[in-house]
Amino acid sequence: MTLSHEQADYARKRIVEDGVADQVEIRVQDYRDVTDGAYDAIASVGMAEHVGEAMLPVYAAHLYALLRPGGRLLNHAISRRPGPRVRTSRTSFIDRYVFPDGELEPLHVMVAAIEGAGFEVRDVESLREHYALTLRCWVANLEERWDGAVTASSPGRARIWRLYMAASALGFQANRIGLNQILAVRPDHHGHSGMPRTRAALNGAER
């Protein structure tokens, strides 16, 4: 599910290449327009940052409604440090050139919205240091393929993304911004989650 036609086209190409086109459906659709279900699991990756704090309860409630009892939600999102929202030259740059609709929230705000919708939060994992390394790899890949990136977009757009990713890597490294995965479940009406009781079992280390 994406709002980007370019992402959808690329994803459709990849599922054909990987031989799973008969098992995967790629949609260009707003999450609020999804009404089919119920689903066993939902993974939301890099989307909650574009919802905004005021709409997070609506977002979480809609995902809850799409899941069957026992259904799981994995919410993967960038977060900011707690405290008042501060506008800086860095955030103004991102707002103007990278993510015009982006709005980072502290982790506890996201957890509260998910719990408020009826979910039980089962696990929270920080991937902050991982993402700093990932961003540095992306910058290196961009620089190695610079001419192709410029051809596909423009010199200015390529420079914007190189600057954004390099600066963001420093932000993650310094713990000014974070990246968290929240695993939650919709319990059934008896309170049963159907989830493993230990983290080792959750990660597949125990059977």
PLM-predicted stretches and their roles:
Residues M1-V34:
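Class I SAM-dependent methyltransferase SAM/SAH-binding core
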Residues R27, A38, A54, L163-A169:
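Flexible, glycine/threonine-enriched loop-and-boundary segments that flank and lead into catalytic domains
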Residues R27, A43, L74:
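Conserved Rossmann-like nucleotide-binding pocket used by diverse enzymes
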Residues R32-A43:
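A short acidic, Gly/Pro-enriched loop at the edge of an enzyme's catalytic core
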Residues V34, H50-V51:
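A short His-aromatic
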Residues S44-E49:
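Residues lining the SAM
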Residues P57-R72:
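A short glycine-rich, Lys/Arg-flanked "PGG" loop and its adjoining helix->strand segment in the class I
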Residues I78-H192, A200-N203:
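Substrate-binding/catalytic lobe of Class I Rossmann-like enzymes that use SAM or dcSAM, i.e.
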